[in-house]
Amino acid sequence: FAKDLKIPQNFEVVLDVDLLLQEAVERVIGKAGEDPEFTKVLLDFALEKIEDDRSWDIGFDLLKIGKLIFDENNAAHLKSLNAIELGDFLKLQNHLKKQTKDIEKKVEELATACLELITNAGLDFKDFPRETLPNHFKKIIAGNYSPTQLYNNKLENNLIEGKILKATVKNAPIDLAPQLLVYYQTIKQLIYKRGLFANINRNIVPFALLNAIQKELKIIQEEKDQLSISEFN
């Protein structure tokens, strides 16, 4: 039976997976200060917790993350992480950070171009109802990239319909609204792309640590000729 499963003849089935997980988490945390990559990932994780107003004690959250390993619904998916090294996660993180900064620079340039387009057309920002449209671009230039705050309004519809100026404003360029619409929609696509990258980036560190815990669990079980009850089943 053991031979068929390619496990030690005298293997021990571990019923208390919490103890096994605790040891794996302690080993992962213990690498802080020894391994530069682990140190960076653990520090990033702790800083994320502080930013979310959670306790800086990462042990509790690592245990919570680690329990996903013993859920049979996750087993097949998590095994696919085994071939990924910690450095690969960090490379992806750095790549996404660069892409995010590039997007931020691009949308700032486009939003600035929108304001210039308005002023070059001989218009004042006060010519727009409540200055909503100019303020929209000003928010982006100021670093507001929240889709909820930027796009929970009728600005796009107004641009499509050409209803962007006060009724008292006459002789505005006919092509102003269509031009601004192109800028608006281009920026919108980039803002949502940035949001996607940010969400992926937020999950890279937890995934990297989950992978590290999974590898430590395997090492521990091989050292002690053990098999967790979830794997045995």
Across the structure, where does each feature detected by a protein language model lie?
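Conserved ATP-dependent motor core of P-loop NTPases, especially the RecA-like helicase ATPase domain
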Residues: 1-143, 223
